[in-house]
Amino acid sequence: MWQLVFFALSCDLVLAAAYNNFRKSMDSTGKRQYQVQHGPCSYTFLLPETDNCRSPSSSYVSNAVQRDAPLDYDDSVRRLQVLENIMENNTQWLMKLESYIQDNMKKEMVEIQQNAVQNQTAVMIEIGTNLLNQTAEQTRKLTDVEAQVLNQTTRLELQLLEHSLSTNKLEKQILDQTSEINKLQDKNSFLEKKVLDMEDKHIVQLQSIKEEKDQLQVLVSKQNSIIEELEKQLVTATVNNSVLQKQQHDLMETVHNLLTMISTSNSAKHSLVAKEEQIIFRDCAEAFKSGLTTSGTYTLTFPNSTEETKAYCDMETGGGGWTVIQRREDGSVDFQRTWKEYKMGFGSPSGEHWLGNEFVSQVTNQKRYVLKIHLRDWEGNEAYSLYEHFYLSSEEFNYRIHLKGLTGTAGKISSISQPGNDFSTKDADNDKCICKCSQMLTGGWWFDACGPSNLNGMYYPQRQNTNKFNGIKWYYWKGSGYSLKATTMMIRPADF
């Protein structure tokens, strides 16, 4: 369509150019013919001649003297009329020419436009057909691609869903494993801390053992020097046999004098024993009430029996009347004893001793007793725990301890585990631990799973009493690794 419009405009411009050239030629030259070339066509126009036009030779001089003025005026009017006629003829010819050109050009333009339209229409139809075919082919290809993309998208969505489910499952497993790892790390940290503490304590114990070893080596060296000195003295004594004989004679006289003194002291002892037999009590409270208010060793009888035992009576602490059932003060007595020894008692009542589980069990089951435990550390501090009700079961129940109503300054919590635990020794394991606490911590005691206390443990001297888990300990006063200097356990009737 645009090509047709362009072609029509081109033809109009050509015709206009030809007409302008024709008019210019007529105005400037006055020729009889005019030729127009348009494409393969050539147009020639014949024009009439202007015979009445004045020639240049007939021109007159402008400065001539005008003598016959009227004659010249008529001639000029006539010539003007001729020129006007000529102009009218030329105008008519031009109008005819224009009409002819327009008629011919219209026909040619119509033919050209029809041919152009037909050609363009065929071309456009062919182009449209090709475009439709290409569009159909592209549409088919796009449909195939869309189907492939849809299938691929569906498959990817399924894979994505599967991956999402797998990812969620893995995330849950990772969270569970992370939680387990954190728990294991906490346990590991706790165990590492315990191991480090044990290593530190082990190092301290090794240092203490090393110091004891050095002391023993010094003692052995001293003993070696003493033995050498004794050997020298023995050699000297062997050589000086005569001197020994004289000394033997002197010794015989001394022995005779000693025998005389012993016989005299035996008679005095018999009289003292007879006096003691007259004052026998079931506990120290009865002795106190009878007027004996001096602390010391007294003879006590088992309830409902004539069997006797020696016990130390504290007649000063807290109003007196206390029967001491245990004392630790210098480490002179070994408390790693058998079941039978703890049952009957051992040691000296005036020093370190254990009164005996059987006697304490029988006495505390006759009436209600209180138990007082007095403690002293190596810095001179003292504390106590007082139980308002205390008794021991019989041997049938392993002398199980029973305590109620704790007061005192040695901790707000009882360091003897409750409810009551059975008594254990190195040859009778009655605790609640598979580790045999009596053998690990030494001494007989009411162990739970070893527990927070043991007043019958190993005695450690000053500067060696820390970080000792088998020492004399009372956890809720000094902790589990501090070994005390002195302890006293004593009982008294609750109604005293």
UniProtKB/Swiss-Prot annotation:
Gene3D superfamilies named in the record: Gamma Fibrinogen, chain A, domain 1 (3.90.215.10), Gamma-fibrinogen Carboxyl Terminal Fragment, domain 2 (4.10.530.10)
Subcellular location: Secreted
Domain comment, as recorded: The Fibrinogen C-terminal domain mediates interaction with the TEK/TIE2 receptor.
Residue ranges of domain Fibrinogen C-terminal in the record: 275-495
Swiss-Prot/TrEMBL keywords: Angiogenesis, Calcium, Coiled coil, Developmental protein, Differentiation, Disulfide bond, Glycoprotein, Metal-binding, Secreted, Signal
Gene Ontology molecular functions: metal ion binding; receptor tyrosine kinase binding
Keyword Protease assigned: no
Function: Binds to TEK/TIE2, competing for the ANGPT1 binding site, and modulating ANGPT1 signaling. Can induce tyrosine phosphorylation of TEK/TIE2 in the absence of ANGPT1. In the absence of angiogenic inducers, such as VEGF, ANGPT2-mediated loosening of cell-matrix contacts may induce endothelial cell apoptosis with consequent vascular regression. In concert with VEGF, it may facilitate endothelial cell migration and proliferation, thus serving as a permissive angiogenic signal. Involved in the regulation of lymphangiogenesis.
Primary localization class, coarse: secreted
Coiled-coil stretches noted in the UniProt entry, renumbered to this chain: 130-255
InterPro entries, alphabetized: FIB_ANG-like (IPR037579), Fibrinogen-like_C (IPR036056), Fibrinogen_a/b/g_C_1 (IPR014716), Fibrinogen_a/b/g_C_dom (IPR002181), Fibrinogen_CS (IPR020837)
Span of the signal peptide: 1-18
Quaternary organization: Interacts with TEK/TIE2, competing for the same binding site as ANGPT1. Interacts with ITGA5. Interacts with SVEP1/polydom. Interacts with THBD; this interaction significantly inhibits the generation of activated PC and TAFIa/CPB2 by the thrombin/thrombomodulin complex.
Protein name: Angiopoietin-2
Residues with glycosylation annotation: N89, N119, N133, N151, N240, N304
GO biological process assignments: angiogenesis; blood coagulation; cell differentiation; Tie signaling pathway
Residues at which Ca(2+) binds: D429, D431, C433, C435
One cellular component (GO) term of this entry: collagen-containing extracellular matrix
PANTHER family for the chain: FIBRINOGEN ALPHA CHAIN (PTHR47221:SF6)
Disulfide bond sites: C284-C313, C433-C435, C437-C450
